[in-house]
């Protein structure tokens, strides 16, 4: 893709429906690539089944990829490897680099996520919102 073609590329925010003050959880079972990975990255917690695969396929299609969310989450080295290689990584590698917080069997994925969501739903909303905001402020201060 040349520079002229890039001018015609429109960025679509695939994560707009996820932006909320409340906690969000992604359950990943299967492939989370390109826009699917972007949606998972927009969630606060990512739990994967052992079947999950993650990748940045935009490089394969000569498309630009906004790297900031991935770099913030896993660090520069692992993010750059994913962005430039176009390779898939498995759930256990995703856990090792911090892309996901937990790996469970496919059969336990939905019950695990539902249990966590139920527990989070029991907490006072104001405390949950304040905790999330404080965590993001702390993260942003640490990266400045």
Predicted regions located by residue number:
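Glycine- (often His-adjacent) and acidic-residue-rich active-site loop
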Residues: 1-19, 141-142
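CoA-thioester-processing core
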Residues: 17, 27, 33-83, 97, ...
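Short, structured loop/turn "capping" segments at alpha-beta junctions
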Residues: 50, 76-80, 89-96, 123-129
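Well-ordered beta-strand positions
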Residues: 39, 45, 81, 85-87, ...
């Amino acid at each position: 893709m040349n520079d002229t073609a890039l001018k015609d590329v429109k960025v679509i925010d695939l994560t707009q429906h996820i932006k909320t003050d409340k906690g969000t959880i992604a359950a990943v079972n299967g492939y989370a690539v390109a826009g699917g990975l972007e949606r998972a990255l927009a969630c606060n917690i990512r739990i994967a089944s052992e079947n999950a695969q993650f990748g940045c396929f935009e490089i394969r299609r000569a498309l630009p990829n906004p790297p900031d969310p991935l770099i913030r989450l896993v660090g520069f080295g692992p993010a750059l490897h994913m962005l430039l290689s176009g390779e898939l990584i498995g759930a256990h590698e995703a856990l090792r680099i911090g892309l996901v917080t937990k790996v469970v069997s496919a059969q336990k994925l939905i019950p695990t996520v539902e249990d966590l969501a139920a527990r989070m739903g029991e907490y006072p909303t104001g405390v949950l919102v304040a905790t999330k905001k404080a965590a993001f402020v702390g993260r942003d201060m640490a990266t400045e």
